[in-house]
Amino acid sequence: YVAVQRDNWWEWNYNLELRLRISNQLFFTPSWDQRFQNNSEGYAVPFGEPADTSNAIIFGNRDRNTSTLSLGLDYTITNRLGLTFKLRHYNSKISYNYFNELLSSGRLNRLDEYSGLDDTGVSAYDNNYNAFTIDLFFRWVFLPGSELNLVWKNSIFTEDSFVNDPYWNTLGNTLN
């Protein structure tokens, strides 16, 4: 558990991890990591086309919710051969509260008239980013200090503006 507070910006996170030795050869590690940031400041990247445009460098005050679900499986064939399988889903949702322009002095000036909405009234900045990755490792120690690793990786990335969708809906949309 970690908690940080600065001015009106606060964040905290927690991590749950279970380590299960199923047999002498099989080891299973599921984990869940959750991070919450409220009123954080950061560079605002539009993912849509905002109706109002600005020539200024835009920073945003935003809330960010990040979840990571991981499943790991280690299988030891012999003391020199092993397989490792890792499955991971990373989800980060960013909702903007208001926007600022970066001044030449390095300070931020609040833009009350800038909403960041597109022509349909939807935020051009809110973002729901997902990464689903699968990793498979084969390790062979053929001499002391010498090993061969074969690695296979695959990934799916999605991005949309549905920041209010529940986690399991977001995961389902990523896999479809």
Residue spans for each PLM region:
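Exposed, low-structure sequence patches enriched in small/polar residues
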Residues: 1-176
